[in-house]
């Protein structure tokens, strides 16, 4: 009897799930139909305004009032997004002028969305950020809303708010937002920040200057994030990175970020320090040796090769791997390293054979592909 009861309960649950899925399909389909209908209405009126802008006219007051009333509903905001997604590429300059004219509309509806649930509230800055609706001096009301969202526990709210801040091109707002995140209690992945900074709509040089001015006011974690941003954006800060890298009072993570910077951008003055960090007998943490061994791929020289060859016999696999990769990038051939490959150090011999095996496989694949080109 117990088994039969369990089976009946299981069948009841399965039936309920199937019914739920069927109902959901119908509900979502009906919602899509409604959104499509609203989108068509938006598209007609928006295209009329775009035509007026092309003729040198401004967006009509009636249209602004209509959009103010319509965009207070989430379904209409979704429909608006679909319309703009379709027409944005048609005439970007005219569309940009139209979107900027909607700034007053978004000021009015911002307070409405701030009082909605976190998903709806997060969608508002998403639209602002996606279409670059804000100017460099955005309305205070919207800025205030964005900074409120930066303190929300939802990562969607915080990330979308940051994306909207980046589109303003205002360095003051970006730095202020970064400080809010830095002092907040919510986790914010560093890659989201560094990638977001790369999408900053203003002058990158102005933003970088401002970040360096405020650099010491940030926590260690945020400093590392900013250093990563500099690594991805500019090779003009070798002197600053060298000073930080050689400053023993700095946190290790900051110095690691500096070593990675010199692994991306050649800076002659950093070569001697990198050789020192790549020496596994320097008394420092192993991470220095691991990262510096990879960075030395940009610094050909007798001392570099000597240090990397020595590292091939290290017990740490990452040190061996990075050293072998750097030697390969420096142009070392099988014959150049034959003494190690055929030597008694099994660690060094195996990692080099591994590297050359990989290279041979890649070369064979290229040869097979070349006749078909």
Where do the language-model regions lie?
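Amphipathic alpha-helical repeat scaffolds
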Residues: 47, 81, 110-114, 146-147, ...
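Structural detector for internal amphipathic alpha-helices that build alpha-solenoid repeat scaffolds
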Residues: 82, 90-100, 122-134, 159-168, ...
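Long, charge-dense partner-interaction scaffolds in eukaryotic RNA-expression machinery
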Residues: 252, 281-283, 320, 346-354, ...
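Long, acidic/polar, low-complexity amphipathic helices and coiled-coil-like
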Residues: 111-199
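N-terminal signal-anchor transmembrane alpha helix of single-pass membrane proteins
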Residues: 1-39
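Short inter-helical turns and helix N-cap capping residues of alpha-solenoid HEAT/ARM repeat scaffolds
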Residues: 116-117, 153-155, 185-186, 218-219, ...
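Amphipathic alpha-helical scaffolding segments comprising HEAT/armadillo-like alpha-solenoid repeats
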Residues: 63-68, 100-114, 136-149, 170-181, ...
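N-terminal topogenic membrane-targeting module
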Residues: 26-115
């Amino acid at each position: 009897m117990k088994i039969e009861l369990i089976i009946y309960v299981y069948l009841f649950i399965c039936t309920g799930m199937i019914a739920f899925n069927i109902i959901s399909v119908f509900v979502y389909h009906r919602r899509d139909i409604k959104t499509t209908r609203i989108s068509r209405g938006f598209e007609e009126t928006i295209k009329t305004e775009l035509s007026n802008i092309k003729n040198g006219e401004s967006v009509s007051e009636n249209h602004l009032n209509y959009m103010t009333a319509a965009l207070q509903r989430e379904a209409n905001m979704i429909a608006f997004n679909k319309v703009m997604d379709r027409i944005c590429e048609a005439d970007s300059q005219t569309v940009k002028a139209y979107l900027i004219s909607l700034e007053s509309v978004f000021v009015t509806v911002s307070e409405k969305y701030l009082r909605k649930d976190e998903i709806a509230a997060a969608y508002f800055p998403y639209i602002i950020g996606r279409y670059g609706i804000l100017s460099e001096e955005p309305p205070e009301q919207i800025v205030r809303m964005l900074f409120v969202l930066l303190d929300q526990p939802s990562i969607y709210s915080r990330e979308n708010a940051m994306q909207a801040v980046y589109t303003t091109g205002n360095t003051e707002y970006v730095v202020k937002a970064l400080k809010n995140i830095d002092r907040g209690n919510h986790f914010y992945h560093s890659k989201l920040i560094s990638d977001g900074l790369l999408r900053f709509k203003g002058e990158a040089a102005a933003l970088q200057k401002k970040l360096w001015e405020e650099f010491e006011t940030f926590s260690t974690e945020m400093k590392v994030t900013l250093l990563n941003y500099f690594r991805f954006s500019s090779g003009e800060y070798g002197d600053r990175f060298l000073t930080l890298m050689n400053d023993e009072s700095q946190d290790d993570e900051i110095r690691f970020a500096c070593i990675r910077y010199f692994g991306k951008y050649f800076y002659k003055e950093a070569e001697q320090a990198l050789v020192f960090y790549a020496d596994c007998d320097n008394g420092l943490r192993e991470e220095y040796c691991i990262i510096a061994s990879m960075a030395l791929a940009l610094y050909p020289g007798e001392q570099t090769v000597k240090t990397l060859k020595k590292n091939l016999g290290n017990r740490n696999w990452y040190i061996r791997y990075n050293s072998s990769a750097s030697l390969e990038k420096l142009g070392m051939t099988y014959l150049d390293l034959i003494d190690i490959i055929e030597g008694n150090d099994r660690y060094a011999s195996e990692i080099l054979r591994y590297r050359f095996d990989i290279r041979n496989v890649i070369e064979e694949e290229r040869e097979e592909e070349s006749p078909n080109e």
